[in-house]
Amino acid sequence: ATRRGAGSIETVEMAVKDADGKLLADAIPVVSIAKDGGYSGLEFGDDPSLELDLIASIDHKLGMGRLTGFVVEGLTPYGTNLSQARHKLMLKATFSGIPVAKVGRGTPEGFADPHEFQIAASNLTAIKARLLLMACLLRFGSLPTAKDPDHPTGDELDAIRKAVAAY
């Protein structure tokens, strides 16, 4: 799991099963569905600092020290964010160790555009993508983190890209 530590984001080990092999309640991943729609921005432009709801959600997840993730419900059928500001924040979440899956709205029967740092959950509703992301988090754990999620290095991007591909 990842959490906000003293001045940076750190990776922490966490138990998933008890001595009898049963899933621990605290190990169940916390995966939120973030919806994006047309005209959702409060201001014109692509300033992520104005998207306080997503900033608060990312900060809350990093404060938990648990397995966490996001499913972005965007355009149908492509699953893309309409807002560049919200897309930038979802990339920051990924660079902070929080995996992001993207789906189309409603009951899409198409594809989600592939992205090197986001999971394209093609042919899935947001609920199904959420359950699969929870299973992936239990199997693979959190993504690698960048020391500075706003400015990841090339090596950090390579490690994150490789981990996202495993999902």
Predicted region positions:
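Accessory alpha-helical/coil subdomains and C-terminal extensions
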Residues: 1-82
